[in-house]
Regions:
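Nudix hydrolase/Nudix homology domain
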Residues: 5, 32, 69, 106, ...
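Short, well-ordered beta-strand micro-motif
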Residues: 23-25, 49, 125-127, 148-150
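Acidic, metal-coordinating catalytic segment for phosphate/diphosphate chemistry
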Residues: 10-46, 52
Length: 182
């Protein structure tokens, strides 16, 4: 039971651009004290945008942590205070691929790495796309490319290890069950 554990203290070890690292102190139900380092993250939103032709619009983006470009669905950090996740989704679609979704359907919400992080992610299916001015943000986005991929091709790329991004793997599979792809 989670309510039988108590957090008694938390100290920020590092305040970063994307996340904070904290050391939290807890007491177990038996009264034993222990500490854990935890990544505090505001959360993220991603969208599986499906074009009129049924293909998924993806981005190939440089990811510094992996030191390579990877193919993924549009996504971004929930870095605007009190912004609803649906609004973050629309903002990210505009920034990364220059579209707005006429229809957003929540596919799921999940904990990215609950063993060490509080980051939660929302994944949406975006349909009825309309073109808007692209609003590129940051160095990585200025070098990303946009690709249209069929569901069958995306699922094949997941199976062969070409697509390795977790949110993309989850989002493509969930969306494919709804739109009949894959």
């Amino acid at each position: 039971m989670t309510d039988s554990f108590r957090k008694v203290d938390e100290v920020v070890l590092h305040h970063g651009y994307i996340f904070d690292l904290v050391r939290a102190e807890f007491v177990s139900p038996e009264g034993e004290s222990f500490s854990r380092d935890i990544v505090r993250h505001p959360g993220a939103v991603s969208v599986v945008p499906v074009a009129e032709d049924g293909r998924v619009i993806m981005v190939r983006q440089y990811r510094p942590a992996l030191d390579r470009f990877i193919l993924e669905i549009p996504a971004g950090k929930r870095d605007v205070a009190d912004e609803p996740p649906e609004d973050t989704a629309q903002r990210e679609l505009g920034e990364e691929i220059g579209v707005r979704a006429g229809s957003l359907q929540l596919l799921g919400t999940f904990a990215n790495a609950p063993g060490f992080s509080d980051e939660m992610s929302w994944i949406y299916l975006g349909r009825d796309l309309e073109t808007v001015p692209r609003d590129v943000q940051g160095i990585e986005e200025s070098h990303m490319t946009i690709e249209r991929v069929s569901f069958d091709a995306a699922i094949a790329m997941i199976a062969d290890g070409t697509i390795i991004d977790t949110k993309t793997v989850v989002g493509v599979h969930l969306a494919a069950t709804l739109v009949g792809g894959g």
